């Protein structure tokens, strides 16, 4: 059987992977708008830090499963790991419907972290396997566009359902249907894509980086390579923004007088702009390089967060959410592509797993920072702190990240290295 790469050549399987990641996005989006308000208004949680515990559990578990999911997929294949991710998600709607206290919700989000860590990781790896190096940025852009488009739709749909029928159980019936759909597509229609990555690895002309042991990949992607370190820290800090949207936006905006349905629109605009623009920003990075959109995105997203705390009113908050979404669209798919460029095909899934581990640990770190800041100072103060973190991280990225685009790498200026780790790729 031929394992020739290319999106058009493999369009049927690529489309199924897009459907899969859309379902993954719907799953997390179904929680994003409703669950924090459920904790405050139904389960009686007053501390923002405690509300944030469900994001902490999600983030740290997803981070760990990202790491091992990539490793497992190179041993057992992408499809078994994808199916396992959907099986683990089956109890989540039941837990959310029946939860008598907030800690049940926190446990449910542990399962959500497993689902997202396995299912989304395998979906993006499969698209990279199918697309090949020439269309890698576009493939990742499509993946993230459909995934975060799903987040936006899930947030909006559950907001509408909650506004009409209540915070539970009806919104979580929608979630149950999404999980079943994702599982059926993964089991019945998705094919294994690992052979495409192996065929690509066989064609590599330079093999000095091939077949690195797991520990060496972990070391390189964490601190041994300056560019991968820059990507990992940027990925971790940008998740502070997403944690803020998940934890603080519903609480901050409903306290300011917006309805749950209106909050769903604000959060949906953030996710929708982020998702749709990635159809363009991934391809943009294939044309102009990865580094410019990543650096610009860090500062634009930080500005959007800052703007949210400064303005007042439904339409202004919606506009600020759109600005934040633009920044995330610029940086998010292209950070993944940077890692995909820098990694050898034989250990690319593991390298992406290490990056995604540090990136999604940012949910946990961000939830701690947001919760402590909100409880000690105010919810508004958490917006200022997250914006400052984005600006600082953007500066680090500007200094340390080199260009990784295969056609631009040799001619691009080298990033400044203030006694940091060396580039080894």
Label each PLM-derived region with a short phrase.
Residues 170-187, 383-399:
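Symmetry-related core transmembrane helices of the 12-TM Major Facilitator Superfamily/SLC fold
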Residues 39, 72-73, 160-166, 253-254, ...:
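Interfacial helix-cap and linker-helix signal at transmembrane-aqueous boundaries
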Residues 65-77, 277-289, 374:
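Helix-to-loop junctions at the C-terminal end of transmembrane segments
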Residues 59-67, 151-152, 271-279, 363-364:
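Residue-level signature of mid-helix packing/kink "hotspots" within the transmembrane helices
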Residues 1-11, 192-231, 416-425:
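Juxtamembrane intracellular "pre-TM" segments in multi-pass secondary transporters
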Residues 8-59, 227-230, 234, 239-256:
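Helix-loop boundary and gating motifs at the non-cytosolic
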Residues 80-94, 292-307:
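Structural signature of the two symmetry-related core transmembrane helices
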Residues 108-149, 337-338:
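Cytoplasmic helix-loop-helix junction between adjacent transmembrane helices
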């Amino acid at each position: 059987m031929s394992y020739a790469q290319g999106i058009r050549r493999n369009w049927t399987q690529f489309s199924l992977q897009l459907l899969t990641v859309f379902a993954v996005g719907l799953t997390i989006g179904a929680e994003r708008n409703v669950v924090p308000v459920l904790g405050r208004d139904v389960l009686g949680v007053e501390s923002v830090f405690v509300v944030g515990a469900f994001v902490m559990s999600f983030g740290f578990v997803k981070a760990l499963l990202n790491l091992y999911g990539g490793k497992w997929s190179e041993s057992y294949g992408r499809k078994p790991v994808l199916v396992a991710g959907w099986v683990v998600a089956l109890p989540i709607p039941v837990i959310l419907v029946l939860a008598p206290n907030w800690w049940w919700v926190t446990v449910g989000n542990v399962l959500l972290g497993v689902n997202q860590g396995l299912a989304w990781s395998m979906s993006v790896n499969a698209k990279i396997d199918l697309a090949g190096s020439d269309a890698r940025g576009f493939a990742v852009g499509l993946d993230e566009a459909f995934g975060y488009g799903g987040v936006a739709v899930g947030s909006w749909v559950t907001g509408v359902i909650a506004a009409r029928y209540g915070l539970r159980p009806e919104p979580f019936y929608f979630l149950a249907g999404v999980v079943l759909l994702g599982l059926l597509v993964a089991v019945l229609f998705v094919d294994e894509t690992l052979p495409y990555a192996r065929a690509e690895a066989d064609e590599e002309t330079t093999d000095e980086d091939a077949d690195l042991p797991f520990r060496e990949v972990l070391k390189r992607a964490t601190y041994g390579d300056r560019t991968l370190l820059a990507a990992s820290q940027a990925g971790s800090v940008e998740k502070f923004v997403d944690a803020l949207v998940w934890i603080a936006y519903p609480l901050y905006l409903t306290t300011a007088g917006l309805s749950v349905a209106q909050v769903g629109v604000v959060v949906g605009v953030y996710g929708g702009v982020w998702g749709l623009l990635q159809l363009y920003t991934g391809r943009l990075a294939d044309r102009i390089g990865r580094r410019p959109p990543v650096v610009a995105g860090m500062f634009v997203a930080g500005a959007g967060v800052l703007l949210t705390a400064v303005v007042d009113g439904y339409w202004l908050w919606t506009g600020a959410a759109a600005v934040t979404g633009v920044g995330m669209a610029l940086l998010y798919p292209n950070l993944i592509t940077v890692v995909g460029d820098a990694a050898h095909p034989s250990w690319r899934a593991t390298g992406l797993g290490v990056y995604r581990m540090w990136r999604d640990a940012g949910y946990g770190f961000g939830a701690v920072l947001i919760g402590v800041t909100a409880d000690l100072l105010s919810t508004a103060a958490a917006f200022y702190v997250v914006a400052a973190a984005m600006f600082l991280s953007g500066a680090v990225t500007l200094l340390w990240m080199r260009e990784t685009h295969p056609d631009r790498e040799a001619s691009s200026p080298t990033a400044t290295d203030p006694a940091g780790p060396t580039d080894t790729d």
